[in-house]
Amino acid sequence: MKNLDQRNQIIEHSLKLNSTNLSPLRSGNISLRAEQDNIQGYLITPSGKKYETLKPEDIVFMGLNEEAENNDSVNKPSSEWRFHRDIYVNKKDAQAIVHAHSPHATAVSSHGKSIPPFHYMIALAGGEDIKCAEYATFGTKELSQNVIKALENRSACLMSNHGQVAFGKNL
């Protein structure tokens, strides 16, 4: 199986999302930048599968130029595949992405406002505050555009009424 180590990393960290209550139930998604058959892309958690049952073959490879409906994997990619793809396209330093629906971040994001620099740890997101992407329906192009805008000069943002997303060098 191609990219087995990366697939296992995604499963390991997906389980951590559940066990730490960062993304209860089947919510949230994780991806890693990857190459398969000389195609640049990313591996992403599948849609609708419980993390506890994930196997390496369940993780979906998506090319950076691919739309979900054209993917021939047995499993469908996460419904949020679009903003994962767009982050990888727009943020060349992004190697891993985690999107979670933590109860705390979702509650804070319902205000639709950025988190001000009240603590030095805010700087870890890459700016003087943590932006909040405007609300849009999950899985849409509009949501992806809103996330990319909120991530300008940053590596993390809230998603209004939805949770948070962050990218980095690894999981």
Regions found by a protein language model. Give the residues of each.
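Glycine-rich flexible loops
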Residues: 1-171
